[in-house]
Curated annotation (Swiss-Prot):
Gene Ontology molecular function: any one: structural constituent of ribosome
Keywords: Ribonucleoprotein, Ribosomal protein, RNA-binding, rRNA-binding
PANTHER family: RIBOSOMAL PROTEIN S15, BACTERIAL AND ORGANELLAR, SMALL RIBOSOMAL SUBUNIT PROTEIN US15M
SUPFAM superfamilies: S15/NS1 RNA-binding domain
Protein name as it appears in the record: Small ribosomal subunit protein uS15
UniProt cross-references to InterPro entries, sorted A to Z: Ribosomal_uS15 (IPR000589), Ribosomal_uS15_bac-type (IPR005290), uS15_NS1_RNA-bd_sf (IPR009068)
Family affiliation: Belongs to the universal ribosomal protein uS15 family.
Quaternary structure (record): Part of the 30S ribosomal subunit. Forms a bridge to the 50S subunit in the 70S ribosome, contacting the 23S rRNA.
Length: 91
């Protein structure tokens, strides 16, 4: 259900702006998207897991706030990021 260290390092390497970048908003958004996708798969077989569903909603809200920040500061970066992550635009 959680992300493996190797997968997280791969995401950091793919979305990092500089070599040692681990905390930029794009990297955080990519990691959150991976966690959200993992939880979504978990709910396909565990539909009564309401505690984890609340955690999923918290993660989705955190990702939405990060995407709003990116959109406010750099629209082209935002559009590129959502196309790479495969998520919809925020209204």
């Amino acid at each position: 259900m959680s992300i493996t260290t190797e997968r997280k390092q791969k995401l950091i390497k793919e979305y990092a702006i500089t070599e040692n970048d681990t905390g930029s908003s794009a990297v955080q958004c990519a990691i959150l998207t991976e966690r959200i996708n993992n939880l979504t798969e978990h709910f396909k077989s565990n539909h009564k897991d309401h505690t984890s569903r609340r955690g999923l909603l918290i993660l989705v809200g955190r990702r939405r706030r990060l995407l709003n920040y990116i959109k406010k500061n750099n629209v082209s970066k935002y559009l590129d990021l959502i196309s790479k992550l495969g998520i919809r635009k925020i209204k």
